[in-house]
């Protein structure tokens, strides 16, 4: 007969009616008993013939594709002019005096951040925007393009202008000017000015002779409109495999591709197809390139840098065969849903491409992308705004993967020791935290995103049209992309984006100028940055507490008035460094801080209410006697594991689930095991702060016996049969706690010290976790342990009790590395009326 829930509780000593602990507890270490209980609860039966269950409530398998929901009305968030001050170290020194080694090192890591991948795989531009929403292909394309454009305008992305140059907006950093790969090449007075790009110092761009020469030809500009003969496109050589050698021109100013093996030709331009608004530039350039590079027989495109001339001149005057969008103007409409009708809505569609305020040299950047992008909801609570997801997972996969640096995250006990206090709390919201940290320009070629232009994107996804690479596009071929869906989508989008539809329909390649979210390096850098800033704030205001995890920054002070003064001072300091805070999202928590999914108060820590509700829902939906897919079990364990430290039996209670996940087998919940777990999670106990103290109780054991030293009293006992030494030591610690009630116990066993009881026999682990809950352990060497003699059966010998002081740890968060006392270079601060007369140190 299966074990009933009541019997199981008694067995685990969770009920009071159990016999003396010294007899009952060692029985739980018995292998035979553990095996019988596992059989009764159906824990060991991993091989099942019934089909697995793949969904429990909201939990589906770890690799199942939960299809994100597309919102046609998404708004692109605005990014303020984020520019982290380059002299951030000096500004911090002015604020707090000399920086500690730790703070200095961390701030130097991100000024600028560097990225060294082992191997970079370049993908075709078609993979730039992921077709995540097949129903909303065109809409998603334009929303994503608009998001990328917004990031570029905010100075977060570089725009690839040519193989070795890029343009960007915003304030340049010194490394974007001084370095060989980051020299500032152009600076223009107007952002999208109508002047042509011209180098201000010789020899900075590759093939610098092209620049001034074209400028002079632009001034003359004697070439009138030419008949459209379309020979240039027809003569393109397709062997280079570069996207630039394909049908439509690129926005980075590529002019054409030299025919393979041609000699010096001077009349190329006059025969090339042209459009009036760019005829002078294109022809001058093409004849010049043909002359200067005439003997080259490579099929590679040659770069030419220019601004589009003033777009106020109408672009409808000449034939426009270079631009897919404007070509429709000169064609006959193929149906009532032809794009011709949209293109003729307005005269002036604006320039084909835009250029940034500044231009820099970059390492060689191919016309490719290294990761795809798509849009999702900003977060579960905000579905009106979109968030860009960047997939640079290639750097985390395969043999060439980058092993990202590890960094310390405070565990639950350290966090409680640090933050559980009677302070008033407030949390700050850093807007777009990742986009604060600048990347070195040399990283740009590895972090490329972009799109191949609307025509290719639509063609790739529609079944009835095919764009054949390097084939001259005929009029009929042009209309292949016309369809009712595309027409309706573009008409709706025209209301939103207006003439930007034209700009967004062109191909573009963008590289990251600030750290992107899709790379494993970014969380590490952000954690280093915010922890260094908080360290500076803590030293400036020793009577307060500032702490951060990633972009979550919290401030604590003894009273509300004090907290408000601190908030004003810290906000001004952060703004002076160039850190953007979102004042609308500042939250004042009172005395219970909500942080990292926990509620932390003076009484200790508990999980937040929404997590408790999730757990209740999970148990409500959990099926009994049905095998559940181990991937779904991973999800369940993830949720239950977060709240495990707040239950009686802790992590050991989940061990059967862990075992089935490790074996990649389905798990079947028996009614008793489910009832046991749900009762465990029904009553959650806070994890309390550890207090410093003097250790008075010691425990020790040998495989055959145990000994305790409680003050001046000594006790000993023997086990019925010899036990493994770690099990014996754990039992001794449990006896010490139950006999003395002390929350501080000295032991010489490292496994007991670690307080991880998952490797012990299952029943013993569960019971020990409950008995030792809230106990702190101090290490005492065996030779000095007063309980060593009693454990060996010698009660007569008394070793003196040690004066063992216990100091609770705040973890490896490098928070309280005692910094050398630094003389402040500031005049004495005016002290506001503060209830504190002493510096507040962490509890």
From Swiss-Prot:
Region of interest (Spacer), residue spans: 178-346
EC number: 2.7.7.7, 2.7.7.49, 3.1.26.4
Region annotated Disordered, chain positions: 219-250
Reactions performed catalytically: DNA(n) + a 2'-deoxyribonucleoside 5'-triphosphate = DNA(n+1) + diphosphate; Endonucleolytic cleavage to 5'-phosphomonoester
Marked site (Priming of reverse-transcription by covalently linking the first nucleotide of the (-)DNA) residue numbers: 63
Matches recorded under InterPro entries: DNA/RNA_pol_sf, DNApol_viral_C, DNApol_viral_N, HBV_DPOL, Rev_trsase/Diguanyl_cyclase, RT_dom, Viral_Replic_Matur_Polypro
Domain Reverse transcriptase: 357-600
Record: residues binding Mg(2+): 429, 551-552
Composition-biased stretches (Low complexity): 223-235
Regulation: Activated by host HSP70 and HSP40 in vitro to be able to bind the epsilon loop of the pgRNA. Because deletion of the RNase H region renders the protein partly chaperone-independent, the chaperones may be needed indirectly to relieve occlusion of the RNA-binding site by this domain. Inhibited by several reverse-transcriptase inhibitors: Lamivudine, Adefovir and Entecavir.
Region (Polymerase/reverse transcriptase domain (RT)): 347-690
One Gene Ontology term of the molecular function aspect: RNA-directed DNA polymerase activity
GO biological process: DNA replication; symbiont-mediated suppression of host innate immune response
PROSITE patterns according to UniProt: RT_POL
Keywords: DNA replication, DNA-binding, DNA-directed DNA polymerase, Endonuclease, Host-virus interaction, Hydrolase, Inhibition of host innate immune response by virus, Inhibition of host RLR pathway by virus, Magnesium, Metal-binding, Multifunctional enzyme, Nuclease, Nucleotidyltransferase, RNA-directed DNA polymerase, Transferase, Viral immunoevasion
Family: Belongs to the hepadnaviridae P protein family.
Notes concerning its domains: Terminal protein domain (TP) is hepadnavirus-specific. Spacer domain is highly variable and separates the TP and RT domains. Polymerase/reverse-transcriptase domain (RT) and ribonuclease H domain (RH) are similar to retrovirus reverse transcriptase/RNase H.
Function as written in the Swiss-Prot or TrEMBL entry: Multifunctional enzyme that converts the viral RNA genome into dsDNA in viral cytoplasmic capsids. This enzyme displays a DNA polymerase activity that can copy either DNA or RNA templates, and a ribonuclease H (RNase H) activity that cleaves the RNA strand of RNA-DNA heteroduplexes in a partially processive 3'- to 5'-endonucleasic mode. Neo-synthesized pregenomic RNA (pgRNA) are encapsidated together with the P protein, and reverse-transcribed inside the nucleocapsid.
Protein name from the UniProt record: Protein P
